[in-house]
Amino acid sequence: MLQPKRTKFRKVMTGRNRGLAKGTEVSFGDFGLKAVGRGRLTARQIEAARRAMTRHIKRQGQIWIRVFPDKPITEKPLEVRQGKGKGNVEYWVAQIQPGKVMYEMNGVPEELAREAFRLAARKLPIKTTFVTKQVM
């Protein structure tokens, strides 16, 4: 599972997920999976989508993961009263804004890439679209 090796602070405030994304162009591969909506991806969801793509393309080509879960999410245990401080870190998330290219792929035909991204998108809680590299 993806998570930072070390962080400056153990817990962070919830905050808001506003604004526009950086990394909106396909820059490493030929095809990409771009977010249309906004939300959060957990490390497990990122890994599940990666596995779905890798299995479909049968380890040919190359895949880039352009998102990293760097925000800790805390939860209090079940049946614990409120108060007594903030809960423990349970999992890590990546915050996604519209337009962010989350995965990239090359070395495979477009139809195979399209189907692999469709399978990966089923694992994600965000609406996505298939994009190709713009050649100028």
UniProtKB/Swiss-Prot annotation:
Descriptive protein name: Large ribosomal subunit protein uL16
Family annotation (PANTHER family): 50S/60S RIBOSOMAL PROTEIN L16, LARGE RIBOSOMAL SUBUNIT PROTEIN UL16M
GO cellular component terms listed in the entry, alphabetical order: cytosolic large ribosomal subunit
Main function: Binds 23S rRNA and is also seen to make contacts with the A and possibly P site tRNAs.
Assembly information from the UniProt record: Part of the 50S ribosomal subunit.
Family: Belongs to the universal ribosomal protein uL16 family.
Keywords assigned: Ribonucleoprotein, Ribosomal protein, RNA-binding, rRNA-binding, tRNA-binding
Single GO BP term: translation
Superkingdom, natural source: Bacteria
Single GO MF annotation: tRNA binding
Keyword field contains rRNA-binding: yes
InterPro entries, per database record: Ribosomal_uL16, Ribosomal_uL16_bact-type, Ribosomal_uL16_CS, Ribosomal_uL16_dom, Ribosomal_uL16_sf
